[in-house]
């Protein structure tokens, strides 16, 4: 069996590699080339050098979207992981009954599409704002920001909770018992035993939270649409609006340049996070 796998593994890998090439590598290379071009359709693209990148980086809307996205991604990542870990810790207690029901309830929002969630929360938040006499989301950038935070927490906490539960349950019970024998409190056991052994799980959850935060699009489109005056427009929505909503032959190329910058930014931040958290993982 082992010899057969060694002999035929390239054949089994071929469909996956082909799908990856067709679905990612080729489009990325083509998109990278188009970021240096001016075009309406790709068949009439002509090379303009780094002009698209200069105009993208000098676009004030792109700068506003960048800082808004960074603030959103940082805050949502922290809150998602803290809340998800707290819930996971509570649901892995042996004394708690009906944990499977709670896990299902917390996970269910993750199954709802982002566009649907965006419109649902837009209605809920606007009703709340109107009841207290505040401006609606379309005129209230602070409400839009916190609305996106709340929506994202509601959708993603349950998913991260499941991952944290799996991580907590994989910690050998001998470690916990040894800590109790040594007289460690529950808080000390959590910080000195569970957290170090959870670092691989934390690495995964932080990676997912950061990437999800930066590439958020459909919830942003449905909840705020970037209003008011593009102040709640995240990077993905800014790229979309640049490519499809701005009139003029040059904007498609500028939108493509923004997409390349966005991709490089997310990859760089994710790699830094992976390196930082993996260095703290405990070797079993």
Residue ranges: model-predicted function:
Residues 2-284:
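A structural signal for multi-pass alpha-helical bundles of membrane permease subunits
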């Amino acid at each position: 069996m082992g010899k057969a796998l060694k002999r035929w593994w390239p054949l089994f890998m071929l469909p996956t590699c082909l799908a990856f090439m067709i679905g990612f590598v080729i489009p990325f290379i083509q998109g990278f080339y188009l970021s240096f071009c001016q075009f309406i359709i790709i068949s009439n693209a002509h090379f303009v050098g780094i002009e698209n990148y200069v105009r993208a980086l000098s676009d004030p809307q792109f700068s506003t979207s960048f800082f808004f996205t960074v603030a959103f991604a940082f805050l949502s990542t922290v809150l998602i992981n803290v809340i998800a870990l707290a819930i996971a810790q509570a649901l892995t207690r042996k004394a708690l009954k009906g944990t499977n029901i709670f896990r299902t309830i917390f996970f269910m929002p993750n199954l709802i599409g982002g566009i649907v969630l965006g419109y649902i929360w837009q209605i809920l938040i606007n009703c709340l704002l109107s009841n207290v006499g505040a401006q609606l989301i379309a005129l209230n950038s602070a409400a839009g920001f916190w609305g996106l935070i709340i929506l994202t927490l509601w959708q993603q906490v349950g998913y991260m909770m499941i991952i944290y539960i799996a991580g907590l349950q994989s910690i050998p019970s001998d470690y916990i018992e040894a800590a109790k024998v040594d007289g460690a409190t529950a808080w000390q056991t959590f910080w000195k035993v569970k957290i170090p052994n959870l670092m691989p799980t934390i690495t995964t959850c932080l990676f997912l939270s950061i990437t999800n935060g930066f590439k958020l699009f459909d919830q942003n489109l449905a909840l705020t649409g970037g209003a008011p005056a593009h102040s709640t427009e995240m990077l993905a929505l800014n790229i979309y609006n640049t490519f499809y909503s701005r009139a003029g032959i040059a904007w498609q190329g500028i939108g493509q340049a923004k997409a390349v910058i966005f991709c490089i930014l997310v990859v760089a931040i994710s790699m830094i996070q992976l390196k930082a958290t993996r260095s703290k993982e405990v070797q079993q």
